[in-house]
Design a protein with these regions (language model features):
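Charge-lined substrate channels and their catalytic hotspots, especially those that engage the 3′ end
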Residues: 1-278, 285-330, 366-370, 615, ...
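Electropositive polyanion-binding surfaces
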Residues: 23, 174, 180, 197, ...
Length: 706
């Protein structure tokens, strides 16, 4: 039996201290060193772990109710770990982190805080699975090039001299941990990839994609499979067995930049004065088949990722911009939802059919808005001549649907989205609030109708499916919203019971046009549960719908592609029993994967946007702007400028005498009596902008201090 095995066996029988082990297996300096080497190996391999200076096997640690967790946040002197079931997190003091990094799977002992009654802390007993790839910045510190991880900018790690990979001070890099120490600062890393300067948002965005395993390049097998779709057209043979809708004046409406066009629309009046609305969706499932490399990659990606002027598509361009995209004047295969509505806009019937269509024109939101408003010039009018006679009926139908939305109490949040203006080198030179007109709202409502029909179809047919689920907000979030509303002088009962969507909608309407509009809108949005995908229908709280799914974007969302495939199979005559066997597990897996990847995509898009905003702010250092206090914390104020750029004013820069926080809505200087209230306007100066971290610092403008 080797020394390593002997030590493991001894600890398994009886937890031991280092002194015990040296006394039993050591004796001199050389033997003691071998004991420590064997013990270190056992700890590193997560066979043995330590608690309070006593070593015991991981198996016995589990027996003592140790918890399996994942490190989710790391600070200079602390960490947070998430339980395996993701129900709650645990605070880990710095002395108990054992050098663990974000993403590591760890074994944790939970215990009561020694000084705060009722508060729990934890200690990491062992690192079970190491996540050794990190993204951050190369920084020259104390004469040496070191690595500062994005996940914990307060920590720096040694870059091994022969593994610097040509990195320079300030470069955005990905590294691999080559040697782990007992503390995070003791880890040794080597550069795996250089992205370029961390002062450029486009480089930081590339690093964000890399960190979350989102690849801009498709695998060779996928690209090879996609080649057969290059230049492909729809033949008459392809059209057989489909409803021929080529005679309908179908058209698309998107932004001017859109190249992956999922959806098209048509509208006719019925003899009774009602409407027949057609929502025609790209039939991606006709090309992306189960078992193909394309399908496996689409499942893994689950969504396209959009940021600035870039897109990382779910499908290769030969499909996303080619044969699947409903391009103008090109024959395309579609999956159509044909809906009948009465003269008041109520849905009375629908059917789903496989179809062949030809879009008459690539519509642009701004141009359609001009037509609807009667301000379009002759050139725009000529462009839409084939489809323009549908627009008055579409406007009328949308007015009916908007009224019905209001009656059922749908919550309509202001999006707060911004448009990033880039120069020819990809640098952000301007930021503007994104505006939305009547055509955007109209298309959104028509797509929502088709999504509702798809979910209703599946629920009635009782087939496996991927539903879009939005549950009611939980108690803790509602308590925070209640406090915010009370601080704004708005009475509510939300601390005691869950509000209806109609009640929330009424509050939003009540603050419209006031100083609290943006703050209440943001606070209410944050209190909402996250929408996700599930295999069971649970309804949609925000839309106030019993049935909801995502049917209308199969080029960029896998759930849509998944339900197209399921619905196609049922419409072709497959019986319910076969459907259950074929798709039950698939619906569960697609729901889980799509929910997880959507969260990651949204995080990347938001972080990338922050980097671009900071890049814009760097161009305006020292300049003064008026903003609104959008957040109040003990540390200071968050200020949002008119264009949607947000920065932070530290409390220490407001007054030298210290501040007091009142319920998250006010900072006060008890000496001067000055208050800074949520919703107040404030003149600020941009003083710092960290593109790498996407953070902007403001100070109160000199004239505002007087």
């Amino acid at each position: 039996m080797s020394l390593r095995d002997k030590i493991e066996h001894a600890i398994q029988n009886q937890p031991c201290t280092v002194k015990d082990l040296k006394a039993r297996f050591g004796g001199d300096r050389g033997a003691d060193r071998k004991v420590m080497e064997a013990l270190d190996a056992l700890v590193h391999e997560a066979v043995v772990c330590q608690r309070s200076g006593v070593f015991f096997t991981v198996r016995s640690g589990r027996a003592e109710k140790a918890l399996l967790c994942k490190v989710v946040k790391l600070g200079k002197n602390f960490a947070f770990v998430m339980l395996e079931d993701e129900t709650s997190d645990i605070f880990i003091p710095g002395r108990f982190t054992r050098g663990a990094m974000p993403g590591d799977e760890v074994l944790v002992e939970k215990f009561e805080h020694p000084r705060v009654e009722g508060s729990d802390e934890g200690a990491i007993l062992a690192v079970l699975t190491e996540k050794n790839d990190l993204v951050g910045t190369a920084r020259r510190i104390e004469g040496r090039l070191k690595f500062v991880p994005d996940d914990c900018p307060a920590i720096s790690m040694q870059l091994m001299r022969d593994c610097e990979g040509g990195a320079k001070d300030g470069d955005k890099v990905a590294v691999e941990i080559l040697m782990r120490g007992s503390r995070q600062e003791d880890h040794r890393v080597g550069v795996a990839m250089r992205f370029g300067s961390s002062d450029e948002a486009k480089r930081c965005a590339k690093a964000l994609l890399y960190a979350r395993d989102i690849h801009t390049r498709f695998p060779d097998k996928v690209r090879e499979e996609a080649k057969k779709f290059e230049g492909m057209t729809v033949s008459e043979e392809d059209c057989k067995g489909r409803m021929d809708l080529r005679a309908l004046p179908i058209f698309t409406i998107d932004s001017a930049e859109t190249k992956d066009i999922d959806d098209a629309i048509s509208l006719t009046r019925t003899p009774e004065g009602g409407f027949e609305l057609g929502v025609h969706i790209a039939d991606v499932s006709n090309y992306v088949k189960p078992g193909s490399e394309l399908n496996e990659e689409a499942f893994n990606r689950a969504t396209s990722v959009y940021y600035a002027d870039q897109v990382v598509p779910m499908l290769p361009k030969s499909l996303s911009n080619g044969i699947c995209s409903l391009n103008e004047k090109e024959l395309r295969l579609a999956f159509s939802c044909l809906m009948r509505l009465d003269k008041d806009g109520n849905l009375t019937d629908y059917r789903f059919v496989k179809s062949v269509i030809c879009s008459r024109v690539k519509g642009v939101y701004a141009e359609i808005n001009a037509l609807l408003a009667g301000t379009a010039d002759a050139e725009i009018q000529a462009k839409y001549a084939e489809v323009a006679d549908q627009l008055p009926a579409m406007k009328e139908l949308y007015a009916h649907r908007a009224r019905l939305r209001t009656e059922r109490g749908c919550i309509d949040f202001e999006s707060g989205e911004v448009k990033l203006i880039l120069d020819e080198d990809g640098h952000c030179i301007d930021v503007k609030k994104r505006t939305s007109g009547e055509s955007e709202a109209m298309i959104e409502e028509f797509m929502l109708l088709a999504n509702q029909c798809a979910a209703h179809f599946a629920r009635v047919k009782q087939i496996p499916f991927v539903y879009r689920v939005h549950e009611e907000p939980n108690g803790e979030k509602l308590e925070r919203l209640h406090a915010l509303l009370q601080a704004c002088g708005i009475n509510d009962h939300f601390a005691k019971e869950v509000p209806t969507p109609k009640e929330l909608s009424a509050i939003l309407e009540g603050v419209r046009g006031t100083a609290f509009e943006q703050i209440v809108n943001t606070g209410m949005l944050r209190c909402m549960s996250k929408a996700c995908y599930e295999e069971k229908p649970k309804g949609h709280y925000g839309q106030v719908l019993k049935d909801y799914a995502h049917f209308t974007s199969p080029i960029r969302r896998y759930p849509d592609l998944a339900i197209h495939r399921i619905m196609t199979d049922l419409l072709s005559g497959t019986d319910k029993e076969t459907m259950a066997i074929r798709y039950t597990d698939f619906a569960i897996q697609a729901s889980k994967q799509s929910s997880e990847r959507e969260v990651i995509a949204v995080q990347i898009e938001r972080k990338a946007e922050d980097c671009y905003k900071a890049e814009y702010a760097r161009r305006h250092l020292g300049e003064c702007y008026e903003g609104i206090i959008s957040g109040v914390t003990q540390r200071g104020l968050f200020i949002e400028l008119e264009n949607g750029v947000e920065g932070f004013v530290p409390a220490s820069s407001l007054t030298p005498t210290g501040t007091m926080l009142t319920e998250g809505i006010r900072l006060s200087d008890p000496v001067s009596g000055k208050n800074w209230n949520l919703g107040d306007s404030m003149m600020i100066t941009i003083v710092r902008a960290d593109v790498n971290l996407g953070k902007i610092d403001f100070e109160v403008a000199p004239e505002a201090k007087q």
